[in-house]
Amino acid sequence: MKKTTLGMALAIMSAMPSMAQQNGLTDTGKSKYAVLTSTPINAVKWTDGFWGERFGVFSGTSVQSMWETWQSDKSHGFHNFLVAAGEKRGRRHGPPFHDGDMYKWLEAVASVYAINKDPELEKIMNRFIGCIVKSQREDGYIHTPVIVAELNKRLAELEKSTGKEATQEEIDNTVVGTKVGTAKDGAFGNSLNFETYNLGHLITAGLVHKRATGQTTLYNCAVKAADFLCSFYENNAEALARNAVCPSHYMAIAEMYRETGNPRYLKTAQGMIDIRGMVENGTDDNQDRVPFREQYNAIGHSVRANYLYAGVADLYLESGEEQLMKNLTSIWNDIVTRKMYITGACGALYDGTSPDGTDYKPDNVQKVHQSYGRPYQLPHSTAHNETCANIGNMLFNWRMFSATGEAKYVDIVENCFYNSILPGISLDGKRYFYTNPMRMSDDLPYKLRWPKERTEYISCFCCPPNTLRTLCQAQDYAYSVGNKELYINMYGANTLSTKIDGVGDIEIKQETDYPWDGKIKLTITRLKGKKELTFKMRVPEWAKKAVATTGDGRIKVETDDRGSYMTITNEWKKGDVINIDIPMEARLIEANPLVEESRGQVAVQRGPVIYCLESNDLNGIDIDNIAIPLDAKFTTVETTIDGSRMMALETEAINRAEKPWTGTLYREVGTEKNKVKIRLIPYYAWGNRGKSEMTVWIPAGL
């Protein structure tokens, strides 16, 4: 029975602000139930090292390469906006979610511009933004499949009545519908048109663009889009509930509330979660079979799920509703202890049946796709692990961290960045994965849906721009600000320039070779006078111990409390230093024995980085014949792949020297074996040396 009423959905009080606004990526500075807020969107700049090198590729190659893709006949992405804007005649091409994908790319460009102020990037943004402005209806609705179809219909009617081709002036004066809230006007007629997904990413792009540039042209479009969603919700909530597919709009509306303080947005954010219980014939695949407050496990399509959880976490940060936190905490525990890959990736199944939405009656079985499976159902070769789902997992954990300040959430944020988001893009910044399996084999007896190699473009192009915008924003997750507290979350060589209440303007220089080395040096390069401030330095879950020492040696903190923050409170001045040491050593990881595909196997991790074995490094040895001794000793070896510096691991392994398995299902265990030296590379770097076989999990040998 559906328990939620529309009246309940509309009833909410707006939260009072609690902290100073920081103008960050997720600006929780005034969120009543946030304990932390982000630094400003231009506050952190990678200087060198791992993230400096990666950001150089993303900003110098990737954003431009993707712009070329959007302008090409492969994607037709920009073509669709040119037609919708009346700058070009033609039909619309491509999937309906390409609008949102272009908005994600635009957000990536804005995030890079916030750092480097490249005028060429500003020109690119302005070119696209101009088309968005022309394409958007007066009521704020914009969806190029609908806009183009209606524009072409009206122009055809005009040309039929006049007997001649429409002039540019007539095209410019052809205004598409402006009514709100009815399917006949083209809005939300089909849930698989991804309109809320598109509008959500437009709103987010508008907010990021404003914070990055100070300009309001795109932001004004975002406000109109947000107002359209509010109006549609207020007039036709049930139709909107049916259209919450890959619901980026939950996070977007919450962030618009933070930007404006307008209680209408908070009321809509609350209501959009409440009305999920109004959906008739809801599905586990879309997480709407039962109201959200009755959900305690991660189910269904993993992108839709993780975006939902992140959006609900945003709502909690503003409303403080305890029931929402109960749901989110239970779901988080289900993901992390039973359904998440070692890389932070989510979504084990390409296709399957829901283990939740049925009493095992054949006529009630529900299909799921790209989804969470049963607890501990974590296959290797057929792992879907869509990059968008992994990004959603990161976004969910970041918001949980903002609400609690607990390091366990940042552990997963970091894990996702290194091990399930970075693998989605090639080292040269031009090619992308859609899925992220734990194993890749040449001779699978079935065909997987997505390419085995990264490609520049596939028609389902949601992951590449999402990957790019997230990686272009990695610096925004490096620090958080509390009450006279500075949290150091993700280590990397950078500079920070921000303002902390009660402290004033402060600048920090961070020097490190992380993630290859656990030594980090923090130097205060700007601070007026002496100020009391608490530095909170993350001790990752993988670290056996960590030490922090002030430059003068007066204060030393040492801990073996994994997954925590070391704390030093002191009166600081310009020039003061903190040295952090987090020893790194390679370690073997095993899975819970209920993860059947990983039984008897180990994975290798050093620091935050998960490693893999790739056939390129085996000199013709069958990857299936390699086993790693449980007492293996690893040596770090600096290497480069496609110009990118990294640390490989070498060790002595076992080659079982078995015959091929062709035509064989079972056989007697062989005893022939010999020792062989192997090299493992970071998982994010696999597939950058041509087509290859790869595995994260390797049999344990004696």
PLM regions: where:
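Bacterial Sec-dependent N-terminal signal peptides
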Residues: 1-23
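Long, well-ordered core segments of solenoidal/helical folds
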Residues: 54-89, 124-141, 220-237, 268-286, ...
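Well-ordered alpha-helical scaffold segments within catalytic/enzyme domains
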Residues: 49-53, 57, 104-119, 200-215, ...
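Low-complexity, Ser/Thr/Pro/Gly-enriched N-terminal "stalk/linker" regions
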Residues: 21-101, 126-177
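A conserved hydrophobic secondary-structure block that centers on an alpha-helix together
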Residues: 171-259
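Solvent-exposed beta-strand/loop surfaces of large extracellular or lumenal domains
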Residues: 543-569, 588-594
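Solvent-exposed loop and edge beta-strand segments that line ligand/cofactor-binding
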Residues: 23, 34, 85-102, 118, ...
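C-terminal beta-rich recognition modules with glycine/proline-rich loops and embedded aromatic residues
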Residues: 23, 328, 411-526, 561, ...
